[in-house]
A protein has these predicted regions:
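Short, compact, well-ordered microdomains
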Residues: 56-94
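Compact soluble domain cores
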Residues: 1-61
Length: 94
């Protein structure tokens, strides 16, 4: 799956700055997300993610636990490749 431009929210950046998580760990999660390993999401979310990928439109949401911190990765797919983007965020930043 194409992830487009990658953005990290202020909350995630603060966790990195405070050494609670590492950039390398975020990259591992992004790789899992791009490989269609959505982490801890319900079966209906997996089905929706896969349908959105097949239609190349919509939102792909993954959820992971990293050091007891929930991390969400959200990709927005559009028909225009240059408009695809991915955000690494905390759930409360959604």
């Amino acid at each position: 799956m194409m992830i487009g431009a990658l953005h990290i929210t202020r909350g995630v950046q603060t966790l990195i700055d405070d050494n609670k998580i590492q950039y390398e760990e975020i990259w591992e999660l992004v790789h899992r997300h791009a490989s269609m390993d959505y982490g801890d999401v319900e079966d209906d979310s997996v089905e929706l993610n896969n349908s959105n990928i097949n239609h190349n439109y919509g939102t792909i949401l993954s959820s992971y636990q990293l050091h007891n911190i929930k991390i969400w990765i959200c990709t927005t797919l559009t028909e225009e490749v240059q408009d695809i983007y991915t955000i690494v965020m905390l759930p409360e930043e959604y």
